[in-house]
Amino acid sequence: MTAISLGVPEVPVRPIAERRVSRQIQVGPLAVGGTAPVSVQSMTTTRTSDIGATLQQIAELTASGCQIVRVACPTQDDADALAVIARKSQIPVVADIHFQPKYVFAAIEAGCAAVRVNPGNIKQFDDKVKEIARAAKEHGTPIRIGVNAGSLDRRLLEKYGKATPEALVESALWEASLFEEHDFRDIKISVKHNDPVVMVNAYRQLAAQCDYPLHLGVTEAGPAFQGTIKSAVAFGALLSEGIGDTIRVSLSAPPVEEIKVGIQILESLGLRQRRLEIVSCPSCGRAQVDVYKLAEEVTAGLEGMEVPLRVAVMGCVVNGPGEAREADLGVASGNGKGQIFVKGEVIKTVPESKIVETLIEEAMKIAEQMEQNGVASGEPAVTVS
């Protein structure tokens, strides 16, 4: 029998540019920056003071692949809940602090893995940096300097007229310099804007002027569809240039959706080992089957599969056989039937009514073999006879 490869390429695809060299920090047990893989994070939408609901949402995010979670802390009740949440969370918890510097200290004392501060709206922030640096250093707590276009310091708005890339970068580097004066460099930085073009230019300038790890984000990106497009465009541009160490896709949607999009962006750029990938044609007048329905049913049937499997669902004989051959598993449909391919070889032909069922069965067989041979989490391909 001809050998069939059931794994992934032994040499992963390289990003378009070499990764920017940045210093590495520890956010709890997770390394960010340096040679650490680009991580994906999100933010809870619950009231942090509701410990049960917040931990439940963190558990859902963790299951979806989230690696860092941020929680809001606008009140004393929220601050009081941080210790329990930080202790019980499966992933590092970052406290998101605005307006009140006292909550920065509360978050550090509570054992949060990191604290995000917004220099544009924390009262007397510059005067508090020395104390924050001392407390953070004592507890080993990194600080994220999170600059947002919507809350930029008034003096910078007066200087630049609006939230330009230069204004965002100046704000971030100024605050970083204050921490540096107190020998604190356990820092990561974000300079977010809701315009992807402004955001990309800001991060490019920032990357050229410092070696701190960078948290990428398009702030207030919008509803799911619009926000996904904005984030994909901005992150794709920066990550393909080697810029970015951790990402947060901001969507007006459930937080789990942010993780799905973020992971897909990294997989698409070769920055994360791909998991299940459905390749399907957009359909046209040549299609002899309902490609939309087939693709949706196959996707639903394989939801949750973690192995790096590429499945092609093709609707006609033009590109169908070629795409199916390039996939781990695929179907080229036409004339009321479908040819099922495994690694380029036709293994059977089935009626159209059996295509989805057959693809799912074959995918499960391949996944089981891959797991048995140690390739489920992205190890080199194996060959079976």
Swiss-Prot record:
Gene: ispG2
Species of the source: Streptomyces avermitilis (strain ATCC 31267 / DSM 46492 / JCM 5070 / NBRC 14893 / NCIMB 12804 / NRRL 8165 / MA-4680)
Catalytic activity: (2E)-4-hydroxy-3-methylbut-2-enyl diphosphate + oxidized [flavodoxin] + H2O + 2 H(+) = 2-C-methyl-D-erythritol 2,4-cyclic diphosphate + reduced [flavodoxin]
HAMAP family with a match to the protein in the record: IspG
Annotated metabolic or biological route of this protein: Isoprenoid biosynthesis; isopentenyl diphosphate biosynthesis via DXP pathway; isopentenyl diphosphate from 1-deoxy-D-xylulose 5-phosphate: step 5/6
Pfam families per record: GcpE
The protein's required cofactors: [4Fe-4S] cluster
Binding site for [4Fe-4S] cluster: 281, 284, 316, 323
Chain's role: Converts 2C-methyl-D-erythritol 2,4-cyclodiphosphate (ME-2,4cPP) into 1-hydroxy-2-methyl-2-(E)-butenyl 4-diphosphate.
Co-factor note (free text): Binds 1 [4Fe-4S] cluster.
Keywords linked to the UniProt accession: 4Fe-4S, Iron, Iron-sulfur, Isoprene biosynthesis, Metal-binding, Oxidoreductase
Molecular function (Gene Ontology), one example: 4-hydroxy-3-methylbut-2-en-1-yl diphosphate synthase activity (ferredoxin)
Keyword Amino-acid biosynthesis: no
Record-linked InterPro entries: Dihydropteroate_synth-like_sf (IPR011005), IspG_bac (IPR016425), IspG_bac-typ (IPR004588), NO2/SO3_Rdtase_4Fe4S_sf (IPR045854)
Family the entry assigns: Belongs to the IspG family.
Disulfide bond entries: none
Superkingdom of the source species: Bacteria
Entry's EC annotation: 1.17.7.3
GO biological process, one term: isopentenyl diphosphate biosynthetic process, methylerythritol 4-phosphate pathway
Protein name in the entry: 4-hydroxy-3-methylbut-2-en-1-yl diphosphate synthase (flavodoxin) 2
